[in-house]
């Protein structure tokens, strides 16, 4: 996949009259389509992805996919929404508000590190969307809304930490989110080039655990400086 090919995306025309679904569970059908669409977009990029290939994987028709999503581009937008939604919804289940500020930050950093490490497809799709200059993220109010939840959560943790005297008073939640995300994301997005250039096996478990501890310590030292 080249940057040039990724930027040259010709919208596919939806079929006007899709046949009705023979599935008894529309939500399950949508979920199956989304899961296979993730695979196709990760492997082929947006420009190279084919709705026919997605349909083949789940033994359905191209018409069925258009029935649920309208177009390849809208399917891609909903893939983005699903992947961002997965990380944000899991964060909400960490119950960070119930933890002391330092422990809440540590838990959030560890979760972010683990999520990126275990969900390479999320990282790859975000890389593809950056090639497109966030053109499709711009189309989704849902992505913006769901990602604001992490800033609200971080802001509350930082506020409590300041009140308890364990964190600095000049912290911006967005800066802290960027600090955490940049390390966790880069380690996965660049693992092949970084690993080859510096001859390091980033997926190695001992190296992974060292880096996991390192980012936790780095973030906490920044907050407590």
Which functions belong to the PLM regions below?
Residues 104, 118-141, 191-198:
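Amphipathic alpha-helical segments used for helix-helix packing
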Residues 32, 40-74, 78-79:
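Helix-turn-helix
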Residues 43-47, 119, 164:
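Short coil/turn segments at alpha/beta junctions that flank glycine-rich nucleotide-binding fingerprints
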Residues 29-38, 54, 79-83, 87, ...:
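Generic hydrophobic, amphipathic alpha-helix propensity
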Residues 79-108, 138, 144:
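Amphipathic alpha-helical linker/stalk segments
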Residues 1-17, 111-118, 148-167, 179-225:
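C-terminal peripheral helix-coil segments that are non-catalytic and often amphipathic
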Residues 72, 79, 83, 87, ...:
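Hydrophobic/aromatic residues within well-ordered alpha-helical segments
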């Amino acid at each position: 996949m080249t940057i040039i090919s990724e930027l040259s995306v010709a919208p596919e025309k939806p079929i006007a009259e899709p046949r009705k679904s023979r599935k008894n569970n529309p939500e399950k059908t949508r979920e199956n389509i989304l899961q296979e669409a993730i695979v196709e977009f990760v492997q082929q990029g947006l420009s190279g992805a084919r709705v026919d290939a997605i349909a083949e994987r789940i033994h359905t028709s191209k018409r069925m996919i258009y029935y649920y999503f309208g177009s390849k581009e809208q399917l891609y937008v909903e893939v983005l929404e699903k992947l961002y939604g997965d990380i944000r919804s899991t964060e909400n289940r960490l119950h960070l508000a119930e933890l002391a500020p330092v422990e809440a930050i540590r838990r959030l950093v560890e979760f972010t590190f683990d999520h990126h490490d275990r969900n390479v497809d999320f990282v790859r799709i975000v890389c593809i969307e950056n090639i497109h200059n966030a053109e499709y993220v711009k189309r989704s109010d849902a992505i913006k809304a769901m990602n604001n939840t992490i800033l609200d959560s971080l802001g509350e943790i930082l506020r409590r930490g300041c009140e308890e005297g364990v964190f600095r008073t000049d912290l911006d939640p967005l800066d802290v989110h960027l600090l955490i995300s940049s390390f966790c994301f880069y380690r996965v997005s660049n693992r092949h080039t970084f690993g080859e250039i510096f001859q390091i096996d980033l997926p190695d478990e001992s190296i992974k655990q060292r880096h996991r501890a390192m980012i936790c310590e780095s973030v906490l030292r920044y907050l407590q400086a």
